[in-house]
């Protein structure tokens, strides 16, 4: 049923109308509709109807289901009326970050920006690392950790890389990826960086953003090992090449 007895469109009709609306606003290459897993059968009907009405739009529309978010402490429950909204969760995470950086003497505007950036990264990482179709178990403490698998850890690694680049810029040093130092042994970090294009392409083709999360976490881990074992700004003949590795790391993490 697409039109009820009162002549009003049902949800099915609205979804099909939305598909036409998207096409009218600007022809798209692919439209991905993400809903809760409970909507899977409902969208089978929608997609079947759309394929009959407008096959071209249906061919480039994909429906993906995802699980629901649950908290590790089990405190969220719709029956108890304490469901947390996305904005509410971000605000809560930002408040926790604010407490952690309260002694850093940031200006108010700067502190607010940092709080928001870290909160968003924490939530995005926690959501995107989970394969579609499965429930997301959200642990606030792990999500805000600067160690291990978390958004803030990725941010910390990128800030560390950019700090090295800023120091190099102040000294008027230039990254040189074209001159491989004599006797240089390829580092694990370099091998990871080479995989960036294929990782992004595979994630796109498979609609699997969790692959990018896994990859960027590995890059961050390898970079921190590289940073701990190598003195980048050492005045040696390999300095320019090592700087190029740091710059490439910064670019890759930023674009993930």
What residue ranges belong to the model's regions?
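Non-catalytic interaction-recognition regions
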Residues: 1-256
